[in-house]
């Protein structure tokens, strides 16, 4: 929608990706690029997972009231998109800086996905193996990774009056 609000001016997007795959429509929710998804797809997800939503939401989706600009919208012909940094490039820069300080640096992946707790436990096990056995890397070293973890919230919170606190990174660090 931001790209359309700027019309008729051309829009230049300089994006720094923080998501696996570097999909422009996903980076920062893609406010200046076309959205390939549809309201019909959203309805299909609601149905597939039996997600209850207010009737007004279901009606708005069914009528396409919240449809977003698609790739064939004429204004996107005046828009340019440049990916200026990726997760891998960020990890490589961090590794280079660690090496500058004399540490061996190892990039595990830029596309790790899964529950934050599980991913943290895997990282902790790897760190223990390095410290205790010198495998798969010699200590001391810097282990770097990136990706997109998730946190599954309980269906019924312990206290529904208290707002949820923290997030994926907090969950990862507490589990580490």
Task: Place the predicted regions along the sequence by residue.
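Accessory alpha-helical/coil subdomains and C-terminal extensions
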Residues: 8, 12, 34-122
């Amino acid at each position: 929608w931001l790209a359309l609000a700027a019309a008729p001016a051309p829009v230049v997007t300089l994006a720094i990706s923080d998501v696996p795959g570097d999909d422009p429509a996903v980076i920062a929710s893609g406010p200046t690029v076309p959205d390939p998804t549809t309201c019909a797809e959203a309805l299909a997800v609601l149905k597939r997972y039996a997600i209850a939503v207010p009737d007004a939401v279901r009606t708005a989706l069914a009528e396409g009231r919240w449809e977003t600009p698609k790739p064939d919208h004429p204004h996107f012909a005046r828009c340019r998109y440049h990916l200026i940094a990726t997760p891998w490039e960020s990890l490589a820069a961090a590794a280079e800086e660690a090496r500058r300080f004399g540490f061996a640096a190892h990039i595990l992946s830029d596309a790790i996905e899964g529950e934050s707790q599980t991913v943290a436990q895997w990282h902790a096990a790897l760190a223990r193996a390095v410290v205790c056995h010198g495998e798969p890397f010699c200590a001391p070293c810097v282990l770097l990774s990136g990706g997109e973890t998730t946190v599954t919230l309980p269906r019924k919170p312990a206290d529904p009056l208290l707002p949820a606190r923290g997030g994926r990174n907090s969950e990862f660090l507490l589990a580490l």
